[in-house]
């Protein structure tokens, strides 16, 4: 038999000018660490739908990681007085949050019986214990020392959250910048303990009223105010979609983390991150 004429030809090294041999160079998968990322989904049950549940939450944690990355950068820019530079960063923050809101639609395809089939395998694991989510809340000013307790078994995470608890919030940083534009803020507000949750302050509202009445004069602050409104709007939508999906999937059962489930999540809907930005509307 005649040997195949192509048998001894060298393997192609390119295809349409694309490099094909990565034996000695970095590939797409290498750069992204996909071996680790795609090996991180380890279902505890044999149920088909547990993979959806795991990937939904892991993907959310990745978006939260990016969200924190951008929020820290925005706060740094604001601390440096680069308000205009922070606008683009906060615009990205908003898009990330919109992505997180839309992702609830995927988890909503999980039926009650599909979730029940593997719920017991979660043990006490709950999104309530997400330390990245907690840090996001802290950066937004919703501080709560009790929320450090679920992380005492992981010292480095507990240390990071403790530091975040005592670091001025994004909103605190903006209020400090208001004083640099000769907007009077009460000393008690400026010297407030950063580990305490944001509380409404009359002097802050009065300052925001001036900003909104003269947007051309305080354009950078006005833009920051509107971006914070957009972000809190998206955050409320995220919370609401969370409540809706949980009620749709488990009804009013207790959460795996021990909370009252839907009832607890409904209470959280009342949280206001930037109170004066909402109340000023009534004062204009």
From Swiss-Prot:
GO biological process terms on file: L-tryptophan catabolic process to acetyl-CoA; L-tryptophan catabolic process to kynurenine
Annotated cofactor note: Binds 1 heme group per subunit.
Annotated positions binding substrate: 53-57, 119, 256
GO molecular function per UniProt: heme binding; metal ion binding; tryptophan 2,3-dioxygenase activity
Pathway: Amino-acid degradation; L-tryptophan degradation via kynurenine pathway; L-kynurenine from L-tryptophan: step 1/2; Siderophore biosynthesis; quinolobactin biosynthesis
Catalytic reaction equation(s): L-tryptophan + O2 = N-formyl-L-kynurenine
Recorded superkingdom: Bacteria
Binding site residues for heme: 242
Enzyme class: oxidoreductase
Pfam families (UniProt xref): Trp_dioxygenase
Keywords assigned: Dioxygenase, Heme, Iron, Metal-binding, Oxidoreductase, Tryptophan catabolism
EC number(s) given by UniProt: 1.13.11.11
Cofactor: heme
Entry similarity comment: Belongs to the tryptophan 2,3-dioxygenase family.
Job description of the protein: Heme-dependent dioxygenase that catalyzes the oxidative cleavage of the L-tryptophan (L-Trp) pyrrole ring and converts L-tryptophan to N-formyl-L-kynurenine. Catalyzes the oxidative cleavage of the indole moiety. Required for synthesis of the siderophore quinolobactin.
Subunit record text: Homotetramer.
Name assigned to this protein: Tryptophan 2,3-dioxygenase
């Amino acid at each position: 038999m005649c040997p195949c004429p192509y048998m001894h030809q060298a393997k192609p090294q390119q295809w349409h000018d694309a490099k094909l041999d990565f034996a000695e160079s970095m590939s797409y998968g290498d750069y992204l660490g996909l071996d680790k990322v795609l090996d991180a989904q380890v279902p505890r049950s044999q149920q088909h739908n547990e993979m959806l549940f795991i990937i939904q939450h892991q993907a959310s944690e990745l978006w939260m990681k990016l969200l924190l990355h951008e929020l820290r950068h925005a706060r740094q820019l604001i601390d440096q007085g680069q308000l205009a530079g922070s606008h683009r960063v906060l615009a990205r923050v908003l898009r990330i949050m919109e992505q997180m809101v839309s992702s609830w639609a995927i988890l909503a395809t999980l039926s009650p019986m599909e979730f029940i089939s593997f719920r017991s395998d979660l043990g006490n694991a709950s999104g309530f214990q997400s330390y990245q989510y907690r840090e996001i809340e802290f950066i937004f000013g919703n501080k709560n020392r009790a929320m450090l307790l679920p992380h005492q078994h992981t010292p480095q995470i507990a240390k990071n959250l403790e530091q975040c608890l005592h670091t001025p919030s994004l909103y605190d940083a903006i209020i400090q910048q208001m004083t640099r534009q000769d907007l009077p803020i009460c000393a008690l507000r400026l010297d407030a303990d950063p580990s305490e949750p944001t509380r409404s302050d009359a002097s802050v509202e009065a300052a925001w009223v001036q900003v909104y009445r003269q947007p051309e004069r305080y354009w950078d602050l006005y833009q920051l105010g509107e971006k914070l409104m957009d972000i809190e709007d998206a955050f409320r939508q995220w919370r609401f979609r969370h409540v809706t999906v949980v009620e749709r999937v488990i009804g009013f059962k207790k959460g795996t983390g021990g909370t009252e489930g839907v009832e607890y999540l409904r209470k959280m809907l009342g949280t206001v991150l930037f109170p004066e930005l909402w109340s000023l509307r009534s004062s204009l």
